[in-house]
A protein has these predicted regions:
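Mg2+-dependent phosphoryl-transfer enzymes with acidic/Ser/Thr/Gly-rich catalytic loops
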Residues: 51-55, 88-90, 94-96, 103-188
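Asp-based phosphoryl-transfer active-site loop
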Residues: 23-42, 133, 166
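Short secondary-structure boundary segments
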Residues: 33, 77-78, 99, 143-146
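Short coil/turn segments at beta-strand junctions that form active-site/ligand-binding loops
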Residues: 25-27, 70, 118-119
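Non-catalytic pre-domain segments flanking phosphatase-related domains
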Residues: 1-31, 179-188
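Basic, amphipathic juxtamembrane/active-site segments
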Residues: 41-64
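Short, basic/glycine-rich phosphate-binding loops at helix/coil junctions
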Residues: 38-44, 83-90
Length: 188
């Protein structure tokens, strides 16, 4: 993209050249859970068990990212066994639960994976996510994120959290890196 202000047409709508340029360099995608991978609702069973719904299209996008050399990590404020199980199913090995200060987990990931902040994308939905989002190369807010987060993000998804917003981000990263066609036809 040579012209400032130019954009790329995607199946999700136009994406600015600046966002595409940032997405080209991403090697680690960090995701929140509640409000990003799920719709933010927590269902409580009669025996106190916690239930959440996860979108299979998000799962497919995550698997495509992982098989295209983009690491995926979860940093979430809550702790739930079902999140651990979902990560195991998808092949996500970097899971940080119960994080009231997400910067601690973020710093640990950077050190563990030897990745610079500019090579990280973070997808969040609420103000707890902003301290990490302001440090990464590509900050993403889901469409239904907190109103104060949306204008601060580099990119806002067209799709709401829990409704395949993560898939939109994965597709964007793969498209920017010229890997989207390679990801077609994979199975999860």
């Amino acid at each position: 993209m040579s012209k400032a202000g130019a954009s790329l047409a995607t199946c999700y709508g136009p994406v600015s050249a600046d966002v595409i340029a940032k997405a080209e360099n991403i090697r680690l995608l960090i995701l929140d859970v509640d409000g990003v991978l799920s719709d933010g609702l927590i269902y409580m069973g009669n025996n106190g068990e916690e239930l959440k719904a996860f979108n299979v299209r998000d799962g497919y996008g995550i698997r495509c990212a992982l098989t295209s050399d983009i690491e995926v990590a979860i940093i979430t404020g809550r702790k739930a066994k079902l999140v651990e199980d979902r990560c195991a199913t998808l092949g996500i090995t970097h899971l940080y639960q119960g994080q009231s200060n997400k910067l601690i987990a973020f710093s640990d990931l950077l050190e563990k994976l030897a990745i610079a902040p500019e090579n990280v994308a973070y997808v969040g939905d609420d103000l707890i996510d902003w301290p990490v989002m302001e440090k990464v190369g590509l900050s993403v807010a889901v469409a239904d994120a907190h109103p104060l987060l949306i204008p601060r993000a580099d990119y806002v998804t067209r799709i709401a959290g829990g409704r395949a917003a993560v898939r939109e981000v994965c597709d964007l990263l793969l498209l920017a890196q010229g890997k989207l066609d390679e990801a077609k036809g994979q199975s999860i």
